[in-house]
Amino acid sequence: MWLRPSIWLCFPLCLALPGQSQPKAADDLGGLYCGPSSFHFSINLLSQDTATPPALVVWDRRGRLHKLQNDSGCGTWVHKGPGSSMGVEASYRGCYVTEWDSHYLMPIGLEEADAGGHRTVTETKLFKCPVDFLALDVPTIGLCDAVPVWDRLPCAPPPITQGECKQLGCCYNSEEVPSCYYGNTVTSRCTQDGHFSIAVSRNVTSPPLLWDSVHLAFRNDSECKPVMETHTFVLFRFPFSSCGTAKRVTGNQAVYENELVAARDVRTWSHGSITRDSIFRLRVSCIYSVSSSALPVNIQVFTLPPPLPETHPGPLTLELQIAKDERYGSYYNASDYPVVKLLREPIYVEVSIRHRTDPSLGLHLHQCWATPGMSPLLQPQWPMLVNGCPYTGDNYQTKLIPVQKASNLLFPSHYQRFSVSTFSFVDSVAKQALKGPVYLHCTASVCKPAGAPICVTTCPAARRRRSSDIHFQNGTASISSKGPMILLQATRDSSERLHKYSRPPVDSHALWVAGLLGSLIIGALLVSYLVFRKWR
């Protein structure tokens, strides 16, 4: 029998254009700092395989590849850092930044030459910063000047402008190091990755605090202790999910709260007690909209154990995931998207039944296709699976991956896997690759028993072209993903070579006319020559 509850699945990716090598996530592309108006990050360019450092590349909004260099017109500034590293600042309004889902996105890559001298992208990383950046109150001049140079606690890594430093609620002096530092007050921030950041000066009270006694009120274990200290400052940084942080939801707002307190030196004798220290108790709150899609919070959902198998119809949850490699050992999380890929690089897709332990259930895929937007009905479309089988009209056919061989799965019949080579949509008139997002969609149903013929798809061996019309069968439902693909170009010189060596197409009719005219001219000359000889 068929269990009618099913799901229509899709998932986002980021693509790049053709290249031979597959990019890998670059661990040394890091050090990101999200400023109020620009990205700040550092990159280590030293290659482990060659003494020649690779080139730093970036993609524009149309997916074309460029060398990353100083270009004020495009809002990029590059400077040499310590050792082989480079520091980069990129304006959110520049040529290489795209806005999506309340975030600024900037794909960065490292380009190296192979043994034949062909340059290709070998590493990629996508930097993300939130669009909404709330400025904090700037400390007064007295609170800044009163901090000795040797006792200043850095507020942000260099390079940073005065405007960006003030947006963080910190002090700025370009002639000193650090140039951006905390003032003699309390500076608290709610970071985009879901952390409290609280800097406290001992001079925030009079008399000064016992600075080494400042601690979180509800937890004081190792992860909740200060991450940095000077003789004047302590800096706390901890996630919303730890250190006794309280959460409450009021209307459309989620509020995260914690408290800092400072101990006092109390002197006691038989007739009473005294103290000469200030009372300090600080409550810090971070407030976010529950309906926002750009919460800077890493959310973990802990579900109850699945119920025992039932034989009657009931609600089912299906999930589509993208694996990081062909082993399906790990998957991209929601925070990893958009995912950067090169064209023709395989994407490993998995659709599964969730939270069920009935081994007799089977998952059946119907259609899988791609669209350039979130709507599964959007045109143009490109099929990947048709009636559960690879679409034969594609020269890079989708590959079905048997799940039964996966020994680490308790219920293999709950899973379906396939791989597809990444691609970009092409304008049917201009014959150029379309920029913008690309989405994957699938329709699926759950059947029982899993081994029944109705649950098994048999694909024809012949390379007969199957109908690519996308239609929805009874007993299937739908759901759409919320992330895009980004189209990127893999080599800088491919478009230049195409333009250099391409020529306008030759009209065959024009060639025929030219040949006929040539024949007539030659014939006329020959007749004239014979007449001339006869006359003489």
UniProtKB/Swiss-Prot annotation:
Residues 533-536 are cytoplasmic. Expressed in oocytes. The gene is ZP4. The ZP domain is involved in the polymerization of the ZP proteins to form the zona pellucida. Its main location: membrane. This is Zona pellucida sperm-binding protein 4. GO terms for biological process: acrosomal vesicle exocytosis; binding of sperm to zona pellucida; negative regulation of binding of sperm to zona pellucida; positive regulation of acrosome reaction; positive regulation of humoral immune response; positive regulation of T cell proliferation; prevention of polyspermy. It holds the Pfam family ZP1_ZP4_Ig-like. Keywords: Cell membrane, Cleavage on pair of basic residues, Disulfide bond, Extracellular matrix, Fertilization, Glycoprotein, Membrane, Receptor, Secreted, Signal, Transmembrane, Transmembrane helix. Residues 22-511 are extracellular. Disulfide bonds join C368-C442.
